[in-house]
Amino acid sequence: LHKAIRRQRQMCIRDSTYSETGNSFTDYIFLNKKRVGLKPRLEDNMLDPEHTKSHEIGLNAGFLNDKINLAFTMYKTSTSDLPFGGYLPIPSQGDIYFMYNGCRIDNKGFELTLSANMNIGQVKWDGRFTYSINKNEVKQLLEPQKNPITDTDFNLEEIQMAKGSGWYTPLKKGGSIGDIYVTDLQRDEQGNVVIDKTSQNVVPVNEYIYAGNADPKYTMGLANSFSWKGFELDFVIHARFGGVGLSMTQAVMDQFGVSQATAIARDNGGVWVSGEKIPAENYYRLVGWARTGTVYTYDATNIRLAEMSIAYHIPVNRWVKWIQDVRVALVGRNLLMLYNKAPFDPESTASTGTWGQGIDNFRQPSYRNMGFSVNLTF
């Protein structure tokens, strides 16, 4: 029994780290100013540096002589004194732009990885499953500050980060980075869209409601690798669940009547809303261009075949001794979307910035890549 226990023993490694980092404001200077523009700006020399505290706990465990491995990491970061910019009304001067330390944001989550490697007959198999969750929350918004010109107190209930027709993304205390608010249509007590009998159309409401967050609730990944007699097969499936996205592309095309949705509506004699048919032109001229953001808000859940490769090791060493191995492979990335409700790829990015995520505004479509590789080992 003791020998069996020793053979099947497991190894567990735990670690914990804590760090604090600072990020100073931009050092790029032009004309003795850190920013230049057409409107007057105040110098931002009094800004405090951005400050981040992070704590991470990890666990690594191996079972069955490391044929099965488990890795778990949990983390939390707190970033304070984030710099933001905004306009303040100044009597007799108009609006003046200035920078200020805006808020504190906490970020927490975990990642779980389960991997296995074993032989099934003559086939060697390596598999890896990952599951991760990440959440952020605005814990504190702008502390009461003084107007640098008038010396009066001012405070902000929210910081508007981006805005478009029928939508905007704010920072609010208790909210998260990536929150999207949209305009809606008038509804009855049961939540059904109200139809105006006179105009034979829906009724827009110029108030914003919370649509969701651009970030997923959780992500999953599955990677498998099989090898047999010089052949290799590898594939990766990636999935993100939850989150929302808004398509300005679809909204603009609907406005001009050049989308597939408007063509179908014309062929069907109108658009069915709450059991009533509305003329297609009336409906899309009113809600198009995302004037009603809820119409163009989509679930961002998607599952895709992210990567796949087939390879073969040519045994050239049998004939050419100075070449150890030749590996020929066919590789494809972003090959197949297995599930996606949105009319765009939710994983594609509109920019490298933070505040435009989840908004499809004529962003470039994602690409499917295919190629081959030849590797020689001497």
Predicted segments, located by residue:
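Glycine-rich, histidine-containing beta strand-loop boundary motifs that form or position
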Residues: 74, 235-239
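Short, exposed "boundary/linker" segments that immediately precede the start
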Residues: 1-2, 6
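Compositionally biased, intrinsically disordered low-complexity segments enriched
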Residues: 12, 57, 226, 240-242, ...
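Extracellular/periplasmic, surface-exposed regions of secreted and cell-surface proteins
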Residues: 7-10, 14-163, 297-378
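Extracytoplasmic gating/loop element in the C-terminal half of outer-membrane beta-barrel translocons
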Residues: 240-327, 331-333
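Short secondary-structure capping/turn micro-motifs that flank functional sites
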Residues: 121, 233, 241-242
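Outer-membrane beta-barrel transmembrane strand signature
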Residues: 26-69, 156-236, 277-318
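A surface-exposed, glycine/aromatic-enriched loop/edge motif typical of exported proteins
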Residues: 7-10, 14-26, 135-194, 248-276
